Amino acid sequence: MKLAYIVAKGNFEELMMSIILTMTGSAMDVEADIFFTFYGLNLLKKGGADKAKIKYPPILRTLGTKIFKKKLEKVGYEKPSEMLKKIVETGKVRLWACTTTMELMNVKKEDLIDEVEGIVGAATFLDMAADAKHVLVM
């Protein structure tokens, strides 16, 4: 089975949801393509995944993120950047950066983490997603 994910928000919740779902899926022999677009692209920038913050509540964003990360660590989860590396190392998960978003946000290929499989446009990603059983939007 194959799934496709679109990560369009740069917050911690969407990042962790996509990581945990693809990590679980890879253990079940499920392949996944994850397309990072708009603010989600920031998660693929070097250091970006570890800087991601929770979305709500805005007044507690920094403290809430710190508490959430500590709880995840306590139950055995690693830093988001390490988890991204591990899901790619399974050989079942591929990370894709959006060409248009990179141009709009002036992001260069060298700004991205090494785990990015490639830089593709929406049409290319839709071709990839055409044979996916489900497309999940984060």
Could you tell me what each predicted segment is?
Residues 1-40:
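Long, hydrophobic N-terminal alpha-helical segment
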Residues 4-9, 65-72, 109-111:
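Short, basic, glycine/proline-bearing loop/turn elements
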Residues 17, 44-46, 106-109:
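Short glycine-/acidic-enriched loop or helix-start segments at secondary-structure transitions
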Residues 40-53:
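N-terminal beta-loop-helix "entrance" segment that forms/cooperates
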Residues 50-55, 113-115:
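Short, hinge-like loop/turn segments at secondary-structure boundaries
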Residues 53-82:
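A glycine-rich helix N-cap at a beta->alpha junction
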Residues 77-123, 127-133:
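A charged, amphipathic interaction segment
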Residues 135-138:
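Short hydrophobic/aromatic patches at helix-to-coil boundaries
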